């Protein structure tokens, strides 16, 4: 544990760790985006939240956040429209509004409306951010989700993708008029995994135009579930599959977040792991 704390502390004060993780030089926008990320993984005896963002290096717009506070787990995934610094600023504002509401212990409906208003007031009607907000009660497995024009998360149960956690058609943050979004409510079973992703994952294309697609993502998730690998390793393998499918530099950021609930008694200790990226081949 002490060694881990020393590494985490050193990472805050030296740029060498960050440069090596990135693999190659980033644009200013992508660097800003990278520095916005939380620890890669949070883990307790009840739950694991793991995220991975593979940046397009010249593009920036994806961002994710997560926290564990007692019996409450919050997860968010955002994708700002466009490319470059403008896209990063959109996501930064959405993330800031989200974190403020979460720390004020607001419900998801209020949080959704606040993010929507913040984007609209600052950027007008010409900009938007898609996103998904998730809240899990680890004592009961009760889960709430709100969606803002984003790909619907997948639910993995008993090593099978059993469906999407979807609502009726929703609109992105910034164009909803503060009206919020319908809540999805469900109850997880011990061992369930919720998988959030951005369009950069499923829209990665081979030179012949073949998209990676949701079906391929679901198939790989089921294969990885059968392997019983740790969520962090599952993410690395999924992102590697996206990169291999693309066969070259990504055209858009590709981000995945896994939320796995194991059930069982609550634990006070939360173990963070610092951000990282898949090393280029």
Where on the chain are the PLM-derived regions?
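Regulatory loop-to-helix N-cap segments in sensory/regulatory domains
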Residues: 1-3, 7, 203-204, 208, ...
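Amphipathic coiled-coil signal-coupling helices
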Residues: 6, 10-20
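Catalytic strand-loop-helix junctions within cyclic-nucleotide turnover domains
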Residues: 135-140, 204, 226-227
């Amino acid at each position: 544990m002490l060694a881990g704390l020393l590494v985490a502390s050193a990472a805050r004060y030296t740029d060498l760790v960050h440069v090596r993780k990135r693999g190659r030089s980033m644009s200013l926008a992508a660097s800003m985006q990278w520095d916005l990320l939380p620890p890669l993984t949070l883990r307790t005896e009840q739950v694991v939240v793991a995220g991975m963002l593979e940046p397009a290096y010249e593009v920036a717009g994806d961002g994710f956040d997560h926290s564990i506070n007692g019996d409450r787990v919050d997860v968010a995934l955002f994708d700002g429209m466009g490319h470059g610094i403008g896209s990063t600023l959109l996501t930064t504002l959405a993330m800031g509004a989200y974190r403020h509401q979460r720390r004020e212990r607001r419900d998801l409906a209020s949080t959704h409306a606040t993010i929507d208003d913040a984007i609209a007031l600052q950027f007008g009607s010409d900009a938007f951010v898609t996103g998904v907000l998730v809240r899990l009660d680890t004592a009961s497995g009760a889960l709430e989700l709100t969606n803002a024009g984003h790909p619907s998360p997948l639910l993995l149960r008993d090593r099978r993708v059993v469906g999407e956690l979807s609502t009726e058609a929703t609109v992105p943050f910034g164009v909803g008029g503060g009206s919020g979004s319908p809540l999805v409510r469900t109850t997880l079973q011990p061992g369930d995994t919720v998988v959030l992703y951005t369009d950069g994952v499923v829209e990665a294309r081979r030179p012949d135009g073949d998209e990676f697609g949701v079906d391929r993502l679901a198939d790989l998730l089921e294969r990885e579930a059968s392997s019983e690998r740790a969520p962090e390793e599952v993410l690395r393998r999924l992102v590697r599959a996206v990169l291999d499918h693309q066969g070259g530099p990504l055209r858009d950021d590709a981000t995945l977040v896994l939320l796995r609930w194991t059930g069982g008694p609550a634990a006070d200790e939360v173990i963070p792991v610092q951000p990282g990226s898949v090393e280029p081949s």
